[in-house]
C-alpha cells in the first residue's frame, strides 16, 4: 500500500462542523449503509500522555465506521481474511488552526482488495470505492 495513493482526502469549507458531520452521516446512509459507530476522539491528546509528542492538534476528530451487510458478506465470501478491513471507515476532522474547514479521508477499498488477488473481492471493493467517492462528491455540492 502507498499512503499517498491509497488514502483519499478532501477538504470542505464549513462554518458548523457538527452540521457538516450530520450531513455527512446522512449521505452515507442514503447509499444504504448502516453507521455502526462514530468514535469521537476530539481533543484527547491535549492531555499530556506518557511523554507522547503532540505533532497534530485538532478541534474535532471522528472515525465513522459503516457497512452494508450484503457487501460485507460478498467481501468475506471472496476471502475470509478480508474481514480485518471491516467495517470500512471515514475520518472527519478539523485541525486546530483551520476552524472553517472540515477534512475527510478514507482508505480506498481497492487498496486492500489488491492484497487478496481476488477478482470477486476487487469487484465489490470497486463498488464500495465508488460509493465512498460519491459521498465526497455530494458533500462538495
Mark where each language-model region is.
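Terminal, regulation- and interaction-focused segments at domain boundaries
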Residues: 1-31
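Short, ordered beta-strand-loop transition motifs
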Residues: 2, 56-58, 95-98
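Short secondary-structure transition/capping segments
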Residues: 10, 15, 78-92, 135-141
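Ser/Thr-rich, low-complexity intrinsically disordered terminal regions
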Residues: 26-78
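Short, internal acidic amphipathic alpha-helical interface segments
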Residues: 63-99
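Beta-strand/loop substructures that line and gate deep hydrophobic ligand-binding cavities in soluble
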Residues: 90-118
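Well-ordered alpha/beta subsegment
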Residues: 105, 112-141
Amino acid at each position: 500500500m502507498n499512503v499517498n495513493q491509497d488514502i483519499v482526502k478532501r477538504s470542505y469549507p464549513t462554518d458548523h462542523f457538527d452540521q457538516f458531520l450530520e450531513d455527512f452521516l446522512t449521505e452515507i446512509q442514503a447509499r444504504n449503509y448502516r453507521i455502526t459507530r462514530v468514535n469521537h476522539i476530539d481533543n484527547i491528546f491535549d492531555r499530556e500522555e506518557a511523554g507522547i509528542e503532540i505533532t497534530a492538534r485538532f478541534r474535532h476528530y471522528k472515525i465513522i465506521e459503516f457497512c452494508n451487510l450484503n457487501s460485507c458478506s460478498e467481501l468475506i465470501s471472496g476471502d475470509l481474511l478480508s474481514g480485518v478491513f471491516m467495517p470500512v471507515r471515514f475520518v472527519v476532522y478539523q485541525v486546530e488552526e483551520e476552524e472553517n474547514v472540515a477534512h475527510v479521508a478514507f482508505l480506498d477499498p481497492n487498496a486492500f482488495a489488491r492484497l487478496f488477488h481476488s477478482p470477486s473481492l476487487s469487484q465489490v471493493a470497486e463498488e464500495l470505492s465508488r460509493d465512498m467517492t460519491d459521498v465526497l462528491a455530494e458533500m462538495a455540492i
